[in-house]
């Protein structure tokens, strides 16, 4: 039962990050969430347009 809730929590977190990335568009380079002793960081690696 607990693993079911953990799976749902991970899916919701992934969808939230994906949605935020789509909304921010090209202006997003790094996204960091810090809560208590947990840090989640998403970094986009890309080559700038010339």
Curated annotation (Swiss-Prot):
Location within or outside the cell: Cell inner membrane
InterPro entries membership: Hok/gef_toxin, Hok/gef_toxin_CS
Transmembrane parts of this sequence: 5-25
Name of one Pfam family that matches: HOK_GEF
Primary localization: membrane
Membrane topology classification: Single-pass membrane protein
Gene Ontology cellular-component annotations: plasma membrane
Keywords of this entry: Cell inner membrane, Cell membrane, Membrane, Toxin-antitoxin system, Transmembrane, Transmembrane helix
Matches recorded under PROSITE patterns: HOK_GEF
Annotated family: Belongs to the Hok/Gef family.
Functional description taken from the UniProt entry: Toxic component of a type I toxin-antitoxin (TA) system. When overexpressed kills cells within minutes; causes collapse of the transmembrane potential and arrest of respiration. Its toxic effect is probably neutralized by an antisense antitoxin Sok RNA.
Name listed for the protein in its UniProt record: Putative protein HokF
Species this chain originates from: Shigella flexneri
């Amino acid at each position: 039962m607990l693993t079911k809730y953990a799976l749902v929590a991970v899916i919701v977190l992934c969808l939230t990050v994906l949605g935020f990335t789509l909304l921010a568009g090209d202006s997003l380079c790094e996204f960091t969430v810090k809560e208590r002793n947990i840090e989640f960081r998403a970094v986009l690696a890309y080559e700038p347009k010339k």
